[in-house]
Amino acid sequence: MHIAVVGLSHRTAPVEIREKLSIPEQTMETSLQTLRGNDQVLEVSILSTCNRLEIYTLVRHPERGISAISDFLGQHSGLAAEDLSPHLFNFHHDEAVAHLMRVAAGLDSLVLGEGQILSQVKKMVRLGQEHKSMGPILNRLLTQAVSTGKRVRSETNLGTGAVSISSAAVELAQLKLGQAQGEDQLMTLESELVAVVGAGRMSRLLLQHLQAKGCSGVMLLNRTRQRAEDLSADFPELPVECRPLDDLNHCLSTCSLVFTSTAADDPIVDASLLKQLKRRSFLRLIDIGVPRNIASDVVDLPGVESHDVDDLHEVVSRNQEARQQMAKEAEVVLQEETRLFLEWWDSLEAVPTINRLRATLEAIRAEELQKALSRMGPDFSARERKVVEALSKGIINKILHTPVTQLRAPQARQERQQALRVVACLFELDPPLEDG
């Protein structure tokens, strides 16, 4: 068995490629079942965010397993192998484990140390458990990754003042407003007519940061108006006008700054739509949805400026240098957590021998107990039989405790294998079945 990860991220692929591989929650079960149906895949879980799509697996054979996952991604995206493969990465065993720890800690994020990725890893664990695509190995690995992410944020300064995709989007709007006025600095949004399209988690964060940056009011649109009203109720100090998504044309005609973050599979704004509108002002669009909510053809229109998640690099790079030093603190934690998991993984090599040893001793115990009880005669009560049986089981457990602990203890693989051979020889244990 081998742990492997195959995927792509903002580091390896532009948004126009990433959006083709995005797997929304409503189709996650189907994707997991498809992957689990491959005879190479023993366990699987999927991390799908606006900046990455990563498939973590336990496979029978590393090369064949990685090939099977890559084939799935090609079929899912509709991209030819020559178009997709340059953007894919894959890691095997210790590199896969170390990569996941970095992801959960926020060290592989566009926004270094951002906290939202930890929630997304937790969601990956929940979906994998709900859809029963994970087994003991990935359960252990992903649960430890979540713990590692929490530990990094509590034991280092990396999480202090960390920005998110949403806060970076608001800063990008401030920066572009300043640049339009000939200033290379963040400008207030107080005079802007601002709209947010969507009422999910990213939109909640947008409202939070817009309020913090002095925004005077927001038009909030959502397919379900009630959800927009529920969200706006959490921001009593920010004037929010809730509207249904059907009012999108009105929003685009009247607002000067529009953020989009919906779960739509296709763009909800394109050039043909904007051409039909009588806009009152310059329109700045900032799209943090993946798949994208704003079609790329709008950039050719006069009076329209459009940005997507890949454009956030411009503001992220302004505060990354200071955070790089904080990341070095986190690396120490990641190395320790990776080592702990790999030690646990190595200890699994002893499990078949331990199980066969336990079964051998249990058979001896049961046989000898039966002989003893048969000699006791009918005067030996049921209660006394239970006491003797418990005694025999306790003796076996005491005998097994020290050798089992030693076989599972961290040690060089060569030393463990030698110890396993000695135990198998001493107790004449049958060899384990080879994994197919």
Curated annotation (Swiss-Prot):
Pathway: Porphyrin-containing compound metabolism; protoporphyrin-IX biosynthesis; 5-aminolevulinate from L-glutamyl-tRNA(Glu): step 1/2; Porphyrin-containing compound metabolism; chlorophyll biosynthesis. PROSITE patterns: GLUTR. NADP(+) binds at G198, A199, G200, R201, M202, S203. Catalyzes the NADPH-dependent reduction of glutamyl-tRNA(Glu) to glutamate 1-semialdehyde (GSA). PANTHER family: GLUTAMYL-TRNA REDUCTASE 1, CHLOROPLASTIC. GO terms for molecular function: glutamyl-tRNA reductase activity; NADP binding. During catalysis, the active site Cys acts as a nucleophile attacking the alpha-carbonyl group of tRNA-bound glutamate with the formation of a thioester intermediate between enzyme and glutamate, and the concomitant release of tRNA(Glu). The thioester intermediate is finally reduced by direct hydride transfer from NADPH, to form the product GSA. Substrate binds at T49, C50, N51, R52, S109, E114, G115, Q116, Q120. Possesses an unusual extended V-shaped dimeric structure with each monomer consisting of three distinct domains arranged along a curved 'spinal' alpha-helix. The N-terminal catalytic domain specifically recognizes the glutamate moiety of the substrate. The second domain is the NADPH-binding domain, and the third C-terminal domain is responsible for dimerization. It catalyses: (S)-4-amino-5-oxopentanoate + tRNA(Glu) + NADP(+) = L-glutamyl-tRNA(Glu) + NADPH + H(+). Pfam families: GlutR_dimer, GlutR_N, Shikimate_DH. The record marks H99 as: Important for activity. Its EC number is 1.2.1.70. The active site is at C50. Belongs to the glutamyl-tRNA reductase family. This is Glutamyl-tRNA reductase. Keywords: Chlorophyll biosynthesis, NADP, Oxidoreductase, Porphyrin biosynthesis. GO terms for biological process: chlorophyll biosynthetic process; protoporphyrinogen IX biosynthetic process. InterPro entries: 4pyrrol_synth_GluRdtase (IPR000343), 4pyrrol_synth_GluRdtase_dimer (IPR015896), 4pyrrol_synth_GluRdtase_N (IPR015895), GluRdtase_CS (IPR018214), GluRdtase_dimer_dom_sf (IPR036453), GluRdtase_N_sf (IPR036343), NAD(P)-bd_dom_sf (IPR036291), Shikm_DH/Glu-tRNA_Rdtase (IPR006151). It comes from Prochlorococcus marinus (strain MIT 9303). Homodimer. The keyword Heme does not apply. The gene is hemA.
